[in-house]
UniProtKB/Swiss-Prot annotation:
Keywords: Cytoplasm, Elongation factor, GTP-binding, Nucleotide-binding, Protein biosynthesis. Catalyzes the GTP-dependent ribosomal translocation step during translation elongation. During this step, the ribosome changes from the pre-translocational (PRE) to the post-translocational (POST) state as the newly formed A-site-bound peptidyl-tRNA and P-site-bound deacylated tRNA move to the P and E sites, respectively. Catalyzes the coordinated movement of the two tRNA molecules, the mRNA and conformational changes in the ribosome. This is Elongation factor G. Gene3D superfamilies: 3.30.230.10, 3.30.70.240, Elongation Factor G (Translational Gtpase), domain 3 (3.30.70.870), P-loop containing nucleotide triphosphate hydrolases (3.40.50.300), Translation factors (2.40.30.10). GO terms for biological process: ribosome disassembly. Residues 9-296 form the tr-type G domain. Its main location: cytoplasm. Transmembrane segments: none annotated. GO terms for cellular component: cytoplasm. The keyword Chaperone does not apply. It is found in: Cytoplasm. GO terms for molecular function: GTP binding; GTPase activity; translation elongation factor activity. The gene is fusA. Belongs to the TRAFAC class translation factor GTPase superfamily. Classic translation factor GTPase family. EF-G/EF-2 subfamily.
Length: 709
């Protein structure tokens, strides 16, 4: 069994990210083929891609979970280890992208040569900026009709606000695309017809018809490099031509320094090709090794002291440092059970040893350690800093938690996961399905932090929440396939509330029942008033004096009032925000009892509530929409049409952010409407804010529906 201790300078932890259908998975497949991990090229459209290993992924032709894989690539005869994470591009799966970026050192952004910079490209670019991930770009699909490399480069400037350094030019276009011009070596890489799998290419002189264009773009490359690197600026000003080595070094320095922070522009080298037609992938691999960071290039990771959150602890990427790692993904393997993917930041990790989960303060034992290749695996005995591996045996660790040496505890910065934006009710079809549903929900929520579950006490339904309709569709599909749960999926119900708007100073109620033998008697006098502000949903005040009601019966009046509040008088929704004051009453030596006073309290409350101007309340959601400026008017108009109240507008990294309060009942279907109104370029998040009174005309409809009218 292997024990790995890698030369960290020769390791690259990268992600491949893009909009859905830009060709990420195909690009990854080609990388695996050329690096010798895969002996057959997997195609996404025939459902055979190695990285897309879930059944739903193969059916839908999209990547849902980030499969991690390790491969090797020699540059100048020196072997390099590349850990690749293939990320999904669909907006519903941004959590997968988010957690991948958290543990990567660099990224390859793939663009569709026909469509250019698409909406989800903007989203993942912003996510990469947030985590300060240096990246290189690959303009893919240049063999397609309508592909335009230079338009795509312009869109990188216009839509992403980045500075592209064009490294290659395409030779030929669409069906005649045959290779690329390399602007560093000023040579052409041409793929011959006979090498259908693109495993070899010829390095030749630049074709005559491209020499002028190549010279012009080479000048632009030198200019861009000089503007962003002091050493190159000196050479440039002296009129000296840099060597290839000097250029490579300068471009590496620029790429590593480009973190996409708020006060700086992301500078990114741009390459081109067609992964599907096997052209341009090897030079892209060279670029991954040449320009993207090794774990040594990334600053020491910072965490904080377990006992003192203000105290910062730094861990360098070295085997000699105490062990620290971040669990960034949980996956259920059909044969092995629960696998936890871990990025090792410092120290060594050995199979069979105990580590500390510093977030929970619990010890965990590492079972086996695996190096993953999509869904195949290789067992290793130990692993060092800078690596990404999967471990078995962790019982309590969930996504985003830190594992570390128990003698040197640290908590690394975790990941933020957005709250679910869409919810549906799910009902198992049988008792057996109910039990299986419990297991399925536990497993799926371990794997996916953006999948949340709660039981609605009012409707008795199990409500599942996620990042979008496709997200929930896939989760329900997995419940059926992997856990054999048969369930009906319905529409969620809004949990309305009821309250009162006016005080009622006195309600007298006498409960009297005589049926032979011991009767029932209880007399109460109460007052009701709304509780203004604050979070109190109910208060009970006892003002009875002189023993008019025996002390032991007073809690029964309180219990009766609370019972009545469970089902409001307008539409049967729970009542909130009421203060009940018990003023006076009377009792009978024989016939009074706790039950009698409970009934009296309940009936008096109902009578009073009818006179206290009852109203219906609805949950209001704090909604934040991030949109390109062109769609701002449409977004605001749409929110207003949903009874929304716009509260603020601001600018954020080139986009506009609209904040407002919108009733939850008006937000169903918003995901699809927003996408169609903004061509998919806007994103939104929402969370519960408060309850507010429902307008009378809307309330009348809700009440009629609740009463079955």
């Amino acid at each position: 069994m292997a024990t790995t201790s890698l030369d960290l300078a020769k390791v690259r932890n990268i992600g491949i990210m893009a909009h859905i259908d830009a060709g990420k998975t195909t690009t990854t497949e080609r990388i695996l083929f050329y690096t010798g991990v895969s002996y057959k090229i997997g195609e996404v459209h025939d459902g055979a891609a190695t990285m897309d290993w879930m059944e739903q992924e193969q059916e839908r032709g999209i990547t849902i979970t980030s499969a991690a894989t390790t491969c090797h690539w020699p540059l100048n005869d020196v072997d390099h280890t590349i850990n690749i994470i293939d990320t999904p591009g669909h907006v519903d799966f941004t959590v997968e992208v988010e957690r991948s970026l958290r543990v990567l050192d660099g990224a390859v952004t793939v663009f569709d040569g026909v469509a250019g910079v698409e909406p989800q490209s903007e989203t993942v670019w912003r996510q990469a900026d947030r985590y300060g991930v240096p990246r290189i770009c690959f303009v893919n699909k240049l063999d397609r009709t309508g592909a335009d490399f230079f338009r795509c480069v312009d869109m990188i400037v216009d839509r992403l606000g980045a500075t592209p350094i064009v490294m290659q030019l395409p030779i030929g276009a669409e069906a005649d695309f045959t290779g690329v011009v390399d602007l560093v070596s000023m040579k052409a890489f041409v793929y011959p017809e006979e090498a259908a799998k693109g495993e070899m290419y010829n390095v030749v002189d630049i074709p005559e018809n491209l020499q002028e264009s190549a010279a012009e773009w080479r000048g632009k490359l030198l200019e861009a490099v000089a503007e962003n690197d002091d050493a190159m600026m000196e050479l440039y000003l002296e009129g000296n031509e840099p060597t290839q080595e000097q250029l490579h070094d300068a471009i590496r320095r620029i790429t590593l320094a480009s973190k996409g922070s708020a006060d700086s522009v992301t500078v990114t080298p741009v390459f081109c090709g067609t992964a599907f037609k096997n052209k341009g992938v090897q030079p892209l691999l060279d670029a991954v090794v040449r320009y993207l960071p090794s774990p040594l290039d990334v600053e020491a990771i910072e965490g904080h002291d377990v006992k003192d959150p203000e105290k910062v602890i730094a861990r360098k990427p070295s085997d000699d440092e105490p062990f620290s790692g971040l669990a960034f993904k949980i996956a259920s393997d059909p044969h092995l059970g629960k696998l936890t993917f871990v990025r090792i930041y410092s120290g060594r990790l050995e199979a069979g040893t105990a580590v500390l989960n510093s977030v929970k303060g619990k010890k965990e034992r590492i079972g086996k350690i695996y190096r993953m290749h999509a869904n195949k695996r290789e067992e290793i005995a130990s692993v060092g800093a800078g690596d990404i591996i999967a471990v078995m045996g962790l019982k309590q660790t969930t996504t985003g938690e830190t594992l570390c040496d128990d003698k040197n505890p640290v908590i690394l910065e975790s990941m933020d996961f957005p709250a679910p934006v869409i919810q549906v009710a799910i009902e198992p079809k049988s008792k057996g399905d109910q039990e299986k549903l419990g297991v399925a929900i536990q497993r799926l929520s371990e794997e996916d932090p953006s999948f949340q579950v709660h039981s609605d006490e009012e409707t008795g339904q199990t409500i599942i929440g996620g990042m979008g309709e496709l997200h929930l569709e896939v989760l329900v599909d997995r419940m059926k396939r992997e856990f054999r749960v048969e369930a009906n999926v319905g529409k969620p119900q809004v949990a309305y509330r009821e309250t009162i708007r006016k005080a009622v100073e006195r309600i007298d109620y006498t409960h009297k029942k005589q049926t032979g033998g011991t009767g029932q008697f209880a007399k109460v006098q109460i007052a009701l008033e709304p509780i203004e502000g604050g979070d109190a949903s109910y208060e009970f005040v006892n003002k009875v004096t002189g023993g008019r009601i025996p002390r032991e019966y007073i809690p029964s009046v309180d219990a009766g009032a609370q019972e009545a509040m469970q089902f409001g008088i307008l539409a049967g929704y729970e009542m909130v925000g009421v203060r009940v004051t018990l003023l006076d009453g009377g009792y009978h030596e024989v016939d009074s009892s706790e039950l009698a006073f409970k009934i009296a309290g309940s009936q008096a409350f109902k009578e009073g509530a009818r006179k206290a101007s009852p109203v219906l309340l609805e949950p209001m959601m704090a909604v934040e929409v991030t949109t390109p400026e062109d769609y701002m008017g449409d977004v605001i108009g749409d929110l207003n049409s949903r009874r929304g109240q716009i509260q603020a507008m601001e600018e954020r990294s080139g986009a506009r952010v609209v904040k407002g309060l919108v009733p939850l009942s008006e937000m169903f279907g918003y995901v699809g409407d927003l996408r169609s109104k903004t061509s998919g370029r806007a994103s939104y998040s929402m969370q519960f804010d408060s309850y507010a009174e429902v307008p009378r005309n809307v309330a009348e409809e809700i009440i009629a529906k609740a009463k079955g009218e």
